[in-house]
């Protein structure tokens, strides 16, 4: 009996990850059987865990917090997106035994916004809240969609300035943000605990979409605040999660899943 193709997500913690359910839905669409597991790597033991996984027949891996930067350094080759992001969330084994690193977070976000939420990014003004790895990972792909303007706001201005210079966008201190944004995306680490960034409510008055990169209960405080402050549409990061997973799956298997039914399936769980 042939062993099933094996995939995994590496993180710490990782028990909460929804990646196994998502990838099993993709496999159903493709009409194949796969194995997809969660691997909690020790801090300091990530490289060894990845090496063991691929040496024992692993066919592809996702990488989540806190290992995305380490995965970048572990990869032998990088996609342009991964190079721009300085982080890797997808590892692809090559025939020569090397590992290629890619970053599908940006595609996950933009596909959810443009294809599922049906909101164009081209020509729009975008405000990014936060300047950590999650935000850095999506800027290169947002720029490919040719928005009129991207502004990054962060509690510590220096970090926002650093990203602004790197990507040729604008930076403002969180307290100085004022209105006129079509799309507002929350990527602050406070979002994970349901903390709302320190921003004035009037910035949401002409906002077509307020988006939180986290999903579920953690996104609720920010999205409620955005809705009450005038945002026309709000969305949590579930679609981004499914979208980045679909892009990873396509890199491993050459099959591009339809994310819409999988987003609906995950919402119903």
Curated annotation (Swiss-Prot):
<protein>
    <recommendedName>
        <fullName>Shikimate dehydrogenase (NADP(+))</fullName>
        <ecNumber>1.1.1.25</ecNumber>
    </recommendedName>
</protein>
<keyword id="KW-0028">Amino-acid biosynthesis</keyword>
<feature type="binding site">
    <location>
        <position position="237"/>
    </location>
    <ligand>
        <name>NADP(+)</name>
    </ligand>
</feature>
<dbReference type="Pfam" id="PF01488">
    <property type="entry name" value="Shikimate_DH"/>
</dbReference>
<feature type="binding site">
    <location>
        <position position="105"/>
    </location>
    <ligand>
        <name>shikimate</name>
    </ligand>
</feature>
<dbReference type="InterPro" id="IPR046346">
    <property type="entry name" value="Aminoacid_DH-like_N_sf"/>
</dbReference>
<feature type="binding site">
    <location>
        <begin position="17"/>
        <end position="19"/>
    </location>
    <ligand>
        <name>shikimate</name>
    </ligand>
</feature>
<dbReference type="GO" id="GO:0004764">
    <property type="term" value="F:shikimate 3-dehydrogenase (NADP+) activity"/>
</dbReference>
<feature type="binding site">
    <location>
        <begin position="130"/>
        <end position="134"/>
    </location>
    <ligand>
        <name>NADP(+)</name>
    </ligand>
</feature>
<feature type="binding site">
    <location>
        <position position="64"/>
    </location>
    <ligand>
        <name>shikimate</name>
    </ligand>
</feature>
<dbReference type="GO" id="GO:0008652">
    <property type="term" value="P:amino acid biosynthetic process"/>
</dbReference>
<dbReference type="GO" id="GO:0009073">
    <property type="term" value="P:aromatic amino acid family biosynthetic process"/>
</dbReference>
<comment type="subunit">
    <text>Homodimer.</text>
</comment>
<dbReference type="GO" id="GO:0050661">
    <property type="term" value="F:NADP binding"/>
</dbReference>
<dbReference type="Pfam" id="PF08501">
    <property type="entry name" value="Shikimate_dh_N"/>
</dbReference>
<feature type="binding site">
    <location>
        <position position="213"/>
    </location>
    <ligand>
        <name>NADP(+)</name>
    </ligand>
</feature>
<dbReference type="InterPro" id="IPR006151">
    <property type="entry name" value="Shikm_DH/Glu-tRNA_Rdtase"/>
</dbReference>
<feature type="binding site">
    <location>
        <position position="80"/>
    </location>
    <ligand>
        <name>NADP(+)</name>
    </ligand>
</feature>
<dbReference type="InterPro" id="IPR036291">
    <property type="entry name" value="NAD(P)-bd_dom_sf"/>
</dbReference>
<feature type="binding site">
    <location>
        <begin position="154"/>
        <end position="159"/>
    </location>
    <ligand>
        <name>NADP(+)</name>
    </ligand>
</feature>
<dbReference type="GO" id="GO:0019632">
    <property type="term" value="P:shikimate metabolic process"/>
</dbReference>
<feature type="active site" description="Proton acceptor">
    <location>
        <position position="68"/>
    </location>
</feature>
<keyword id="KW-0521">NADP</keyword>
<dbReference type="GO" id="GO:0009423">
    <property type="term" value="P:chorismate biosynthetic process"/>
</dbReference>
<dbReference type="InterPro" id="IPR022893">
    <property type="entry name" value="Shikimate_DH_fam"/>
</dbReference>
<keyword id="KW-0057">Aromatic amino acid biosynthesis</keyword>
<comment type="similarity">
    <text>Belongs to the shikimate dehydrogenase family.</text>
</comment>
<comment type="function">
    <text>Involved in the biosynthesis of the chorismate, which leads to the biosynthesis of aromatic amino acids. Catalyzes the reversible NADPH linked reduction of 3-dehydroshikimate (DHSA) to yield shikimate (SA).</text>
</comment>
<feature type="binding site">
    <location>
        <position position="89"/>
    </location>
    <ligand>
        <name>shikimate</name>
    </ligand>
</feature>
<keyword id="KW-0560">Oxidoreductase</keyword>
<dbReference type="Pfam" id="PF18317">
    <property type="entry name" value="SDH_C"/>
</dbReference>
<dbReference type="GO" id="GO:0005829">
    <property type="term" value="C:cytosol"/>
</dbReference>
<dbReference type="InterPro" id="IPR041121">
    <property type="entry name" value="SDH_C"/>
</dbReference>
<comment type="pathway">
    <text>Metabolic intermediate biosynthesis; chorismate biosynthesis; chorismate from D-erythrose 4-phosphate and phosphoenolpyruvate: step 4/7.</text>
</comment>
<dbReference type="InterPro" id="IPR011342">
    <property type="entry name" value="Shikimate_DH"/>
</dbReference>
<feature type="binding site">
    <location>
        <position position="215"/>
    </location>
    <ligand>
        <name>shikimate</name>
    </ligand>
</feature>
<dbReference type="InterPro" id="IPR013708">
    <property type="entry name" value="Shikimate_DH-bd_N"/>
</dbReference>
């Amino acid at each position: 009996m042939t062993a099933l193709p094996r995939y995994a997500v590496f993180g710490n913690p990782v028990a909460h990850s929804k990646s196994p359910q998502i990838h099993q839905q993709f496999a159903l669409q493709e009409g194949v059987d796969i194995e997809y597991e969660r691997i909690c790597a020790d801090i300091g033991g990530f490289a060894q865990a990845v090496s063991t996984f691929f040496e024992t027949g692993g066919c592809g891996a996702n990488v989540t917090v806190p290992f995305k930067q380490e995965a970048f350094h572990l990869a032998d080759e990088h996609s342009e997106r991964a190079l721009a992001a300085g982080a890797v969330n997808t590892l692809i084994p090559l025939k020569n035994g090397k590992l290629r690193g890619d970053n599908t977070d940006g595609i996950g976000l933009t596909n959810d916004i443009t294809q599922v939420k049906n909101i164009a990014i081209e020509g729009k003004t975008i405000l990014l809240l936060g300047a950590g790895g999650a935000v850095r990972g999506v800027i290169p792909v947002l720029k490919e969609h040719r928005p009129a303007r991207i502004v990054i706001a962060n509690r510590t201005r220096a970090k926002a300035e650093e990203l602004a210079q790197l990507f040729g966008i604008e930076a403002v201190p969180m307290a100085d943000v004022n209105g006129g944004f079509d799309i507002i995306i929350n990527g602050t680490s406070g979002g994970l605990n349901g903390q709302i960034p320190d921003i004035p409510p009037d910035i949401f008055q002409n906002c077509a979409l307020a988006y939180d990169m986290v999903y579920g209960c953690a996104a609720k405080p920010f999205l409620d605040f955005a809705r009450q402050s005038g945002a026309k549409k709000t969305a949590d990061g579930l679609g981004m999660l499914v979208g980045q997973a679909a892009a990873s799956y396509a890199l491993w298997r050459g099959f591009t899943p339809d994310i819409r039914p999988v987003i609906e399936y995950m919402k119903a769980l």
